[in-house]
Amino acid sequence: RFKKIRRLGALPGLTSKRPRSGNDLKNQLRSVKRSQYRIRLEEKQKLRFHYGLTERQLLKYVHIAGKVKGSTGQVLLQLLEMRLDNILFRLGMASTIPGARQLVNHRHILVNGRIVDIPSYRCKPQDIITTKDKQRSKALIQNYIASSTQPQEELPNHLTIDAFQYKGLVNQIIDSKWIGLKIN
């Protein structure tokens, strides 16, 4: 994980740790001109590692985004941001996207009153995301919310959360300015 962060820069969905400054790293002493291929590859890898996707999943999302009207890049980021695991991360119910994937896989999360155990589930506007009524599920989410470093003001405007009921609501499709990943 840390090798990926050192290579590609800060990936907030992968871990909360930040890479060291460029002066400390030996491999950045040489300034080599970066080719167009390398730039595109690094940006693709940022997407893959940040959202926890396989190559095949990313290609499928690119194909879907290409069919929709509008900028393919913006539509791709909207598709990735509307995944259930990413929404849990944005709501502060999990500290990282892999942590959110684990919550979903272990069946702690309900969407509109139904258990969803697929992290790539595409959320729609007006979806209500809650935890199971079991004490263990509520305790897990409570720990994440209590230890969250993200203040309530930084919650994207397409999401609302009720921390006391462990409930989140998707208001609308995400606006491009709220996407936390810097992509060229």
From Swiss-Prot:
**Keywords, ordered alphabetically:** Chloroplast, Plastid, Ribonucleoprotein, Ribosomal protein, RNA-binding, rRNA-binding
Any one Gene Ontology molecular-function term assigned to this protein's record: rRNA binding
**The UniProt record lists the keyword Heme:** no
- In this chain the S4 RNA-binding domain maps to 82-143
Annotated Gene Ontology cellular components are: chloroplast; small ribosomal subunit
Domain of life, per lineage? Eukaryota
Q: Which SUPFAM superfamilies match?
A: Alpha-L RNA-binding motif
| Cell compartment(s), UniProt | Plastid, Chloroplast
What is the purpose of this protein? One of the primary rRNA binding proteins, it binds directly to 16S rRNA where it nucleates assembly of the body of the 30S subunit. With S5 and S12 plays an important role in translational accuracy.
What protein is this chain from?
A: Small ribosomal subunit protein uS4c
Per the UniProt record, the source organism is Patersonia fragilis (Short purple-flag)
Please name the gene that encodes this protein: rps4
